């Protein structure tokens, strides 16, 4: 290579690598190291979430109930109240992924469960030591749920959970806080 070719190649490499490196300044998302499914099971109240099509009709009273099945899977029942007062219910199942707090969830019929695209990542990325609150997300940071065992949390707790989500790399400009 000539003397002018090397700087040109380096400049082009940096030009293409720069935007890719700047696209996501946050390290890869990691789940919490341990998750006791016995303690995690039960009903969680959604305090806040990032928008998603599947919950577009949910106006309030959003809950997720997890029940351990004998075979090691988890029955999932999501419920919410629509703006007209009617209830919306979605039932599915979850299974462990390749780490204790990496779960996969599906709401497609059981007979489709062999298809990989019906499963979505459900990672517990922050968890109270006493399992009073949890932050759930997925590797792309497109989805986020702030959950609590209580129907409401005080403003200080919510501010702390939002700050934690921001530290984990979430953009909360579109965060929906349940009434």
Describe each region flagged by the PLM:
Residues 19-179:
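A beta-rich soluble binding module of mature secreted/lumenal proteins
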């Amino acid at each position: 290579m000539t003397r002018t070719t090397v700087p040109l190649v380096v400049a082009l490499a940096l030009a293409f690598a720069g935007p890719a490196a700047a696209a996501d300044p946050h390290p890869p998302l990691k789940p919490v190291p341990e998750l006791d499914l016995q303690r995690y099971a039960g009903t969680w109240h959604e305090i806040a979430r990032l928008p998603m099509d599947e919950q577009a009709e949910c106006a309030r009273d959003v809950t997720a109930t997890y029940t351990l099945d004998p075979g090691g899977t988890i029955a999932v029942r999501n419920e919410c109240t629509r703006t007209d007062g009617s209830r919306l219910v979605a039932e599915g199942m979850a299974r462990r992924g390749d780490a204790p707090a990496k779960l996969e969830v599906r709401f497609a019929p059981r007979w489709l469960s062999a298809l990989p695209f019906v499963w979505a990542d459900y990672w517990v990325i922050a968890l109270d030591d006493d399992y009073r609150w949890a932050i759930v997300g997925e590797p792309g940071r497109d989805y986020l749920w702030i959950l609590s065992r209580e129907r409401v949390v005080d403003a200080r707790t919510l501010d702390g959970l939002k700050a934690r989500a921001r530290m984990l790399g979430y953009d909360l400009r579109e965060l929906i806080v349940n009434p």
